[in-house]
């Protein structure tokens, strides 16, 4: 099944949270937390401005992004992967490695 976001929506596959602390301690359960990073797998056409023009999105497919925890809508598992639908404004940063 394919899913295509509309307008300024972005579909993100959440990256797994690190299971070790910086000091090498293995974290379990809630101590590991949920990552607020993910990989963009699809983007909408853009946001419609007040003047009617279409502004393309700054994020692209393949970008690693940081987003606010708790934002977005969870999508039923598609191809056995849990996905999130976010608006571009929910995304705080693009990670450049």
From Swiss-Prot:
Which family, according to UniProt? Belongs to the GroES chaperonin family.
SMART domains annotated for this entry?
Cpn10 (SM00883)
Where is the protein found, in the record's own terms?
Cytoplasm
Example GO molecular function = unfolded protein binding
Put simply, this protein is called Co-chaperonin GroES
InterPro entries reported for this sequence: Chaperonin_GroES (IPR020818), Chaperonin_GroES_sf (IPR037124), Chaprnonin_Cpn10_CS (IPR018369), GroES-like_sf (IPR011032)
Q: Does the keyword Chaperone apply?
A: yes
The record's section on Pfam families has: Cpn10
Cellular-component GO terms for this entry: cytoplasm
Subunit composition and interactions? Heptamer of 7 subunits arranged in a ring. Interacts with the chaperonin GroEL.
**Alphabetical UniProt keywords:** Chaperone, Cytoplasm
Q: Where's it mainly located? A: cytoplasm
Please name the gene that encodes this protein.
groES
The free-text function statement in the UniProt record for this protein reads:
Together with the chaperonin GroEL, plays an essential role in assisting protein folding. The GroEL-GroES system forms a nano-cage that allows encapsulation of the non-native substrate proteins and provides a physical environment optimized to promote and accelerate protein folding. GroES binds to the apical surface of the GroEL ring, thereby capping the opening of the GroEL channel.
Q: Which organism is it from?
A: Buchnera aphidicola subsp. Baizongia pistaciae (strain Bp)
* GO BP field: chaperone cofactor-dependent protein refolding
